[in-house]
């Protein structure tokens, strides 16, 4: 599947240090092989999350388009606020 990202995700990764980027890259590599490996987000169709020590990676699987859309990489509280704002 092809990986795409939102502008929110792009802003989130700019804030990361080297260790954070390496950790995120490992998660994205796993997701690209098995896109539905994360925890399904309640009330959001085909949206999944994977938790790290301090943040959560949120992505949407668009099966028909063959796309994994990386939505955000934020702490827990920010994730839920941003999901409400995005209205997925």
Model-derived segments and their meaning:
Residues 1-27:
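Arg/Lys-rich, positively charged N-terminal/basic patches that mediate binding to nucleic acids
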Residues 2-4, 22, 52-56, 60-88:
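Enriched for short, Lys/Arg-rich terminal
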Residues 8, 36, 78:
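Residue-level recognition of oxygen-bearing side chains
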Residues 8, 46, 75:
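Residues that form or immediately flank small-molecule/cofactor binding pockets and catalytic motifs
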Residues 10, 47-49, 58:
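Short aromatic/hydrophobic contact patches that present stacked aromatics
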Residues 12, 27-30, 82, 86:
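Residues that form generic nucleotide/phosphate-binding pockets
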Residues 27-51:
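A short, surface-exposed loop/turn module that caps and links secondary-structure elements
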């Amino acid at each position: 599947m092809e990986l795409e990202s939102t502008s929110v995700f792009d802003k989130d990764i700019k804030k990361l240090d080297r260790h954070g980027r390496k950790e995120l890259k490992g998660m994205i590599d796993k997701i690209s092989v098995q896109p539905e490996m994360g925890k399904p987000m309640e009330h959001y169709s085909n949206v999944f999350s994977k938790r790290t020590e301090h943040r959560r990676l949120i992505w949407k699987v668009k099966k028909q388009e063959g796309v994994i859309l990386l939505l955000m990489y934020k702490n827990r509280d920010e994730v839920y606020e941003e999901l409400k704002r995005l209205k997925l």
